[in-house]
Amino acid sequence: CHAFGAHAVFPNTRTVLDFGVQDNKAIHVYKYGLVTSFHMNDRCAAGCGRYLGYIADEFGLSLNELGPEANKAKKETTICSTCTVFAGAEIKELLHNGEQKPDILAGLHKSIVQRAMSLIARSGGVKNEFTFTGGVARNEAVLKYVKQMVIDSYGEVTMNIHTDSIFMGALGGAMFARRNISADLPQGTLVRETGGSVN
């Protein structure tokens, strides 16, 4: 669904990174939006949107404040654990040791993007054009590190990020449903955009 939706909005899409609440997906697509490769994180929600939500709670920030706060960093603090269970304890220890909040957040953002990019590397790397989907694509710091790592590893490629990136999966799902309904209807039946049909 994510690949189909991304391809519908950006027809030249060949690589999709979907950064979701509970999982990350690296997808390669061919023309017509056909999926040729699919990889998803296979352990837990660490490094996904839910992890960022937990981090926001630990710092008393909203999700919308995470990215801008991380972008104030003067350095990126090395984060050893991306496990949600242990992240809170590590953050408290880093703060106790004098690390600054923006620096810790920058390190956290960089760490989760590195995990996502390793997923893309396992799937065969970035092929031009690259489309970034999911709600986390709206996080400024995540976006900064994704762009940086794509350029560092694969050179200059066209990167697509839609303002409604969070809805790409829903769009693809709706398009699949519409196509399947159309295929099941008697020949000559027209499907209205509203979802109704007329003979």
Regions inferred by a protein language model and the residue ranges of each:
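Internal, active-site/partner-interface "lid" segment
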Residues: S62-E93, P186-T189, G196-V198
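Glycine-rich phosphate-binding/hydrolytic loop that grips phosphoryl groups
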Residues: F4, L52-Y54, N160-G196
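Glycine-rich phosphate-binding loops at beta-strand->alpha-helix junctions
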Residues: G124-M149, H162-I166
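Acidic-glycine-rich active-site phosphate/pyrophosphate-binding loop
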Residues: G20-K31, T82-A89, N139-Y154
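Conserved phosphate-binding catalytic cores of ATP/NTP-utilizing and phosphoryl-transfer enzymes
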Residues: C1-G20, K25-Y32, S37, A121-R122, ...
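Adenine-nucleotide phosphate-binding core of ATP-dependent small-molecule kinases
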Residues: A87-L119, I166
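Active-site nucleophile and cofactor-binding loops and adjacent substrate-binding regions
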Residues: C1-H2, L17-V21, H39-G47, G107-H109, ...
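Glycine-rich phosphate-binding loop plus the immediately following alpha-helix
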Residues: V9, K31-K75, M175, R179
